[in-house]
Amino acid sequence: MRRNDKFRMIKAHKGANLMAKYIFITGGVVSSLGKGVAAAGCGALLQSRGYSVHARKFDPYLNVDPGTMSPFQHGEVYVTHDGFETDLDLGYYERFLGVQLSRNDSVSGGRIYWDVLNAERRGDYLGATVQMIPHVSNRIKEYIAAPTDTDFVVCEIGGTVGDIEGKIFLESIRQFANDVGRRNVMFVHLTLAPYLEQSGELKTKPTQMSVRRLLENGIQADMLIVRTPRMLTADERAKIGMFCNMPAKNVISGIDVDNIYKIPLAYDAQNVFDIIAEHFGLENRAGDMTKFERISNYLAADLPTVRIGIVGKYFDVPDAYKSLTAALFHAGIQNNVHVALKKINAETFSPSDCADVDGVLVPGGFGARGVDGKIAAAHYARTTGTPYMGICLGMQVAVIEFARNVLGIKNANSTEFDANCTPVINIMPDHTGDMGGTLRLGAYPCVITPNTRAAEIYGTNKISERHRHRYEMDISREKQFADAGMIISGRSPDGRLPEIVELPNHPFFVAGQFHPEFQSSPFTGHPMFNAFVAAAQKCKK
C-alpha cells in the first residue's frame, strides 16, 4: 500500500512478522515502577519455556534519542552494538534475555515526529494533510512490527497512562491489536498499591483508576502487575480483578525484592507464564529457571566481600551507572564473592577515600568537572599497587596521570579540558560538530597484543567492544609511554587507535577506551570485570 492510504492496516507492512505474538507493557499511577524489569522478567519466563523473545522500548518524550540527555535526569545512556544511543531499559533486556538489540528497538516520540516530518518534506505523503492519525500512529506501528525472527516481541511503552506525550502511543498499540488480531496481543499493566502505615491498609483505588484511564484509551489490560511491599491477599486480588475486569488469578503481586534477578522467580511462582500461555492459546510448558535460581542462591550465600571504589560524578541519580554496577555484580557471581560498592565523588576526591577499598574503578564521563579527582584516583591506584580499571574517560585520565608524573610532561592533558595543553589525549578526526550523533559509537573490533594482561583476560587476540567517545590517546607517543612502563595492549585493526593500555608490572592496572559494561551478562560476567574483581580479591586489604 502507498503511504497516503489513509487508514492502512499494519498487516500490509512489508516484512512484518505476522507469526509473532506481542506483549505490551504499560504503566500507571506513577513513573519508575520498573516496567523495563517487568518486561525483561516476562521475557525470561518465555525463554525458560523454549520461546525466542525480542524486546523494544518506546519513549514518548520528544528528544530524538537519549544521547544528549543529562544523566542527572535520565540515568545512563545505553549503547547498542550498531551504535545507537538508547534508553537504559535496553540494558535490562540484553542482560536478562541475552539478546542483541539495535537502533530499531529504542524509539522516542521525537524520532517518530522526525521521521514523519522528513517524510512529508520528501513528498512521501503525496500532498496529504499530515495528521496524528494515521501518519504518526502508522509510523509507530511500523516500528512495532519491524521484522524479527522471534516467537514473541515484548514492547514497553514509557511514561504513565495519562501523559500527554503518550496518548498517541496508546492509540497506536490499540490499533495494532486490531490489525494483527486481539489474540496475538497481550496488554500487561503495571500499577501501584500504596500501603498506608497509619491505617494498616493496602489501597487499591489508584490501581482501579489507572486501569480505568487505560480503558479510556480503548485498551483492556489482560494482566496486572501491582507494585506492592507485600504479597496481595486473595481478597485483594479478587477486589482488584472485579473492578479491573479480569480474573483474580491475572492480578500479580509485583513485590519489592532486594535484587532484580529474583523477579523472574517471583513471577514464575505466581504462574505468570500460565496466564500468558492461556491468553495466547499456547501449551503449558514446564520452565527451566536454573540460572536465576543460581543467582538467588549466590545472594543468600555467606561469601567474602570485595570492596570496589567507583570514582564518578553522577551519583545523585541511581541509574547513572546502571550497567557498570550490574557488571560488577555479575563479576562477583563469577568470582564467588560479594561486591560492595563505595561511591567516591570525583569533585572532592582525596586519597583517603580509597584507604578502605580493594580496587579502584574510574568510569566514563564527559566534561572537565571532576577530572582532577579522577586523575588523582588513577595516581593513587598506580602508586599503591591497588587494582585499577579504567573505562573510556577512565583510560584517558590514566594516560594523563602517567604522562604528568612518570614522563614528566607537566601540562599533559586532553584537548577536551585544555585547548592549550600538551595533548596526550586528542579529538578523533571526523568526530567534531554537534553533540548529538557525532561520537564514535557502537561495536568496533580490537586486536590484542599477545603475552599481555589483556590477552590473558580475554583469551583471544581479537575482540569486539562497544564505544561512546570522541577523544583518543595520541598514538604517536606510544614508544615514549612503553619505554616508561605503560603499554598499548589493544588497538584498532589498522593500528591507529589505542583501545587498551596497561601496566605490566602492576598487580592489575588495565584501562579500555570502550565500555565493557554494555556486554556483561549475569550468567557469564565480562572478562575485564571478572579479572578486575579477581585481582581485587587477591589484593584484598
Label each PLM-derived region with a short phrase.
Residues 17-341, 347-359, 366-367, 373-380, ...:
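Flexible phosphate-sensing "switch/lid" loops adjacent to ATP/NTP-binding sites
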Residues 220, 247, 304, 356, ...:
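A generic structural signal for well-ordered coil/turn residues at beta-strand boundaries
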Residues 36, 40-44, 48, 356-445, ...:
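Cysteine-nucleophile active-site neighborhood
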Residues 27, 57, 228, 255, ...:
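Active-site proximal loops enriched in glycine and acidic residues that flank catalytic Cys/His/Asp
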Residues 450-541:
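C-terminal and late-domain segments of enzyme folds
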Residues 5-18:
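Short, Lys/Arg-enriched N-terminal segments with co-localized hydrophobic residues
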Residues 317-321, 333-337, 351-353, 369-373, ...:
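Extended hydrophobic-aromatic, low-complexity segments
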